[in-house]
Design a protein with these regions (language model features):
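A compositional/biophysical signature of low hydrophobicity enriched in polar/charged and small residues
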Residues: 1-109
Length: 109
């Protein structure tokens, strides 16, 4: 499973709804992620440029996109951004692979 970090913002509509009816947003989002075969690992309310951060697992990016489309179409979130995250072990494997192919590249100039 691939790991994805998703950030976004709540719309005014969402904030009004949360004030009127407080809810556990992780519990609300988890079934959506599960519906595409993924798993919600963590959900955080954040300060700064974004209002929330989620860490999810899914087979690949094509699997997580439908969940993001549904959330975005709800009108309660905006500015959704998704990045694929790699473990330290995965990144080490990439470094070793790069070392093995480095001689194949000829830089410009």
């Amino acid at each position: 499973m691939a790991t994805f970090i998703i950030t976004g913002n709540y719309t005014v509509q969402a904030i009004q709804g949360m004030i009127a009816n407080p809810s556990d947003r992780a519990a609300a989002v988890a079934p959506l992620v599960e519906a595409v075969g993924g798993k919600l690992l963590s959900y955080y309310a954040t300060t700064g440029e974004t209002d929330f951060l989620m860490i999810c697992e899914a087979a690949d990016g094509e699997d997580i996109i439908p969940a993001l489309m549904v959330a975005g179409a709800s009108g309660t979130v905006s500015n959704l951004k998704t990045v694929r995250a790699y473990s330290s072990a995965d990144f080490m494997a990439s470094q070793k692979k790069a070392a093995g192919i480095a001689a194949k590249f000829k830089p410009a100039g």
